[in-house]
C-alpha cells in the first residue's frame, strides 16, 4: 500500500533545463528510513498525427542523449504552467510539423520510468489535420525532418529496431488498433 510509506524530506541535488534531480527520504511501514534519487519532470505530450492519406506524420530528430537522429512522433515537454495536455499537443504539432489537429483523442497516459522518475506522458491520436505556420523551437527542431510513414511501415520499423523511441512504439500500436492500420 502506497499510503503506508511516508516521504519525510526532499532536497534538490540538481536543477536542470529539462528535469530536476532530488534526493527524497522515506519511512517504510516498518519504520525503516531510506532515500532515493528521483528525477522530477513536468511531463510530456505526444501525438500520432494521421494524415488524410492514412499515413503517420513523424519527425526524424537529433537526440543528444543517444548522439543520433531517431524517427519519432511529435512530442514535447509540458513546460507551460497550467497548460492542459491537449493544448500542449496542439502547440507541439504546430512547432514540429506545422499542423493543427481538428480531432484529438487520448490514447493513454503512462509513467515513463516509475523506478526513478515522476514523469507522466499523454499520447493522443490526431486527425483532421490542417496546415498552420510551423513554429520551430530550438536547435534540434531546426534540423529535424518530417516523414510520412504508413502504419504497416511504422510497425515493421518497430519490429526491426529502426524505431526505438518508447512513446512512438506505444503510440503507433495504440493508434493502429483504432484506425485499422498494422
Place the predicted regions along the sequence by residue.
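Short, well-ordered beta-strand micro-motif
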Residues: 23-25, 49, 125-127, 148-150
Amino acid at each position: 500500500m502506497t499510503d503506508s510509506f511516508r516521504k519525510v524530506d526532499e532536497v534538490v541535488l540538481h536543477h536542470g533545463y529539462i528535469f530536476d534531480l532530488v534526493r527524497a527520504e522515506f519511512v517504510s511501514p516498518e519504520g525503516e528510513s531510506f532515500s532515493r534519487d528521483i528525477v522530477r519532470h513536468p511531463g510530456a505530450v505526444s501525438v500520432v498525427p494521421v494524415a488524410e492519406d492514412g499515413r503517420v506524420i513523424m519527425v526524424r530528430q537529433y537526440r543528444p542523449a543517444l548522439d543520433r537522429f531517431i524517427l519519432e512522433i511529435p512530442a514535447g515537454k509540458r513546460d507551460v504552467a497550467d497548460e492542459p495536455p491537449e493544448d500542449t499537443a496542439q502547440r507541439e504539432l504546430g512547432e514540429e510539423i506545422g499542423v493543427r489537429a481538428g480531432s484529438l483523442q487520448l490514447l493513454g497516459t503512462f509513467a515513463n520510468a516509475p523506478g526513478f522518475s515522476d514523469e507522466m506522458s499523454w499520447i493522443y491520436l490526431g486527425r483532421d489535420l490542417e496546415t498552420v505556420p510551423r513554429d520551430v523551437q530550438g536547435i534540434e527542431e531546426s534540423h529535424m525532418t518530417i516523414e510520412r510513414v504508413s502504419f504497416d511501415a511504422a510497425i515493421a520499423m518497430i519490429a526491426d529496431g529502426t524505431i526505438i523511441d518508447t512513446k512512438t512504439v506505444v503510440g503507433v500500436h495504440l493508434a493502429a488498433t483504432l484506425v485499422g492500420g498494422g
